[in-house]
Amino acid sequence: MAVTIFAAIDVGSHETSMRIYEISKKYGVHEIEYVHHTARLGLETYSTKHISYTTIDKLCNILNGFSEKMKEYDIHDYMIIATSALREADNNLIVLDQVKQRTGFLIKILSNSEQRYLCYKSLALKENSFHSLIKDGTLLVDVGGGSIQLSLYDKKTLIATQNIKSTKTFSFISIGRIVEDNPKMNKRIIYTV
């Protein structure tokens, strides 16, 4: 029976994480290890639009540690993605170059649409209840380091989606206003505190 070991690395706003999976036709996808370290790229990107050399150094050290862990499992198949913290940094090309030079890794920066697609796809694959959940009116709220994504489903169909950039003045009152301004959302949401 062929078994593939795959590593998925996420360079996020707050932390950089690696999940190692065992994949086989017989047993499907099974997570065998999860490793994460705080890097806080978003702290700099969202306040200065720039990632410092100190943070780049920390990121490279984390990724080199992940590389050692991948050697333990003899992993050759992997993907490294980054989201808004790297996407919105004005020096993201320098960061990508430094990572490539110092770790050998190529990072793919996902667009917001790609990020949300993968998030919802993973929910659909992982949770048996996902399809029954979106059968009725459902609001999915994806809170990230750089933004909040609201996605409204009804009868298993995506009706509306809205991305809200996080700012220092952002509050959940903003979500309420967006919901109230969208008749389809307003009919289907129960407000709770």
Model-predicted regions and their roles:
Residues N92-I94, Y120-S122, S151-D154:
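Short acidic, glycine/serine/threonine-rich loops at helix termini
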Residues G104-L110:
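A glycine-rich helix N-cap at a beta->alpha junction
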Residues A2-V29, S132-T161:
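Gly/Thr-rich phosphate-binding beta-strand-loop-beta motif of the actin/hexokinase/Hsp70
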Residues H14-Y53, K155-I189:
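Short glycine-rich, Thr/Ser-proximal phosphate-binding strand/loop in the N-terminal lobe
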Residues D57-K69, T192-V193:
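Short, well-ordered amphipathic alpha-helical segments that serve as non-catalytic structural scaffolds
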Residues I134, I190-V193:
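Phosphate-interacting basic helix/loop segments used at nucleotide- and nucleic-acid interfaces
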Residues A2, N112-T138:
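Conserved phosphate-binding catalytic cores of ATP/NTP-utilizing and phosphoryl-transfer enzymes
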Residues K69-D97:
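Short beta-strand-loop/turn "lid" adjacent to the catalytic site in phosphate-handling enzymes
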